[in-house]
């Protein structure tokens, strides 16, 4: 499965986070069962590193989001291309 990676600029409207703008920064493909881990490794390969425990990977069924653990702010998203 192939994914497009986007960096997210989002704002909080009081109830939920809304994407304001996104920037394509790369893509990755994987056959692994653990797609969340493959997403994190792809970001690491692009030079994006997170402190342990600061982010969480959320799979909503349509895409994967890396969110700030405390605020829930989306930072990166992986969107399926196939």
PLM-predicted stretches and their roles:
Residues 2, 25-27, 74-75:
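Secondary-structure boundary/capping motif
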Residues 3-10:
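A short beta-strand micro-motif
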Residues 4, 22, 70-72:
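Residue-level detector of intrinsically disordered/flexible regions characterized by low predicted structural confidence
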Residues 12-17:
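Short N-terminal binding/cap micro-motifs at the start of the first secondary-structure element
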Residues 19-33:
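A short, exposed loop/beta-hairpin motif centered on an aromatic-Gly-Thr core
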Residues 35-42:
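Short amphipathic, charge-patterned alpha-helical segments
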Residues 44-82:
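Short, mixed-charge low-complexity intrinsically disordered segments
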């Amino acid at each position: 499965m192939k994914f497009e990676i986007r960096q997210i600029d989002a704002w909080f409207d009081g109830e939920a986070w809304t994407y304001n703008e996104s920037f394509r920064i790369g893509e990755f493909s994987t056959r692994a069962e653990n797609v969340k881990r493959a997403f994190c490794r792809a970001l690491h390969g692009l030079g994006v590193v997170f402190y342990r425990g600061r982010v969480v990977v959320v799979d909503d069924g349509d895409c994967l989001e890396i969110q700030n653990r405390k605020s829930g702010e989306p930072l990166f998203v992986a969107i399926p291309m196939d």
